[in-house]
Amino acid sequence: MGLPGGWELVLIVGVLVLLFGATKLPQMARSLGQSARVFKAEARGMKEDEEAAKREKQAKSEPQQLTAGESSAPTVASPVEETQRNDSKK
């Protein structure tokens, strides 16, 4: 039992026209299309939120992955060391 064929589709459309009337069918189709667009937009929004949460989680975990030889803050030479280096070059 597969998909309905040509005559079966005509019969289904005829029954729909009799049940709902010719004026209601375009309105129902339009409403169905709008609902599908809203559903797609919400699904896309949820996917983007999920990806943003993953990126945020990765950003938080990256600074914690330092090796033993690395330090988290850059080191700055004190002014005393700089003057001693300059004096020794002269």
Swiss-Prot record:
Keywords: Cell membrane, Membrane, Protein transport, Translocation, Transmembrane, Transmembrane helix, Transport. GO terms for molecular function: protein transmembrane transporter activity. Residues 61-75 have a biased composition (Polar residues). The keyword Hydrolase does not apply. It is a single-pass membrane protein. One of its GO terms (cellular component) is TAT protein transport complex. The Tat system comprises two distinct complexes: a TatABC complex, containing multiple copies of TatA, TatB and TatC subunits, and a separate TatA complex, containing only TatA subunits. Substrates initially bind to the TatABC complex, which probably triggers association of the separate TatA complex to form the active translocon. This is Sec-independent protein translocase protein TatA.
